[in-house]
Amino acid sequence: MKIIAKKDLFINDEIRVREVRLVGLEGEQLGIKPLSEAQSLADASNVDLVLIQPQAVPPVAKLMDYGKFKFEYQKKQKEQRKKQSVVTVKEVRLSPVIDKGDFETKLRNGRKFLEKGNKVKVSIRFKGRMITHKEIGAKVLADFAEATQDIAIIEQRAKMDGRQMFMQLAPISDKK
């Protein structure tokens, strides 16, 4: 049975229903019981009566050590947060008239970011009259995309935004 844990579940005296479908300490079904009988069973076992599914008919209550349950749940949540990887967007700035050596340095940095699992935004800023030659900037972006095609996919094609042209690359995920 999957327990949906909210911030606070109804426990012991907070439960305000007549009867509950009772689940034992080991997960065994104890049947539909009046609330008073369920609470006396919980007291006898020295555990809490926790209403785990209040929307069910009749509501489902379980005998459990609530403190231990809450601790385990928080521990599980913390573990899941650790496993999540945060993807950041790194930026590599280029120029439409970039030299080969500079391009290779920027390319090396971009590849490093992609290998670490980050997305890369490749941008070109047009200065002065360079804006009239957008095709040169598009060629530089295309060369960058072609040089990283073995480890990245184009997430967003080359696009103009004011005096800036950019595209976004994402690492090829291993989870196919």
Curated annotation (Swiss-Prot):
PROSITE patterns, alphabetized: IF3
The entry's keywords: Cytoplasm, Initiation factor, Protein biosynthesis
Cellular location(s): Cytoplasm
Gene3D superfamilies: Translation initiation factor 3 (IF-3), C-terminal domain, Translation initiation factor 3 (IF-3), N-terminal domain
GO molecular function annotation: ribosome binding; translation initiation factor activity
GO cellular component: a single term: cytosol
Major subcellular site: cytoplasm
SUPFAM superfamilies referenced in this protein's UniProt entry, alphabetically: Translation initiation factor IF3, C-terminal domain (SSF55200), Translation initiation factor IF3, N-terminal domain (SSF54364)
GO biological process: ribosome disassembly
Subunit structure: Monomer.
HAMAP family (alphabetical): IF_3
Function statement: IF-3 binds to the 30S ribosomal subunit and shifts the equilibrium between 70S ribosomes and their 50S and 30S subunits in favor of the free subunits, thus enhancing the availability of 30S subunits on which protein synthesis initiation begins.
Family indicated by similarity: Belongs to the IF-3 family.
Protein name (database record): Translation initiation factor IF-3
Organism from which the protein derives: Streptococcus pyogenes serotype M1
Taxonomic lineage of the native organism: Bacteria, Bacillati, Bacillota, Bacilli, Lactobacillales
Gene name tied to this protein: infC
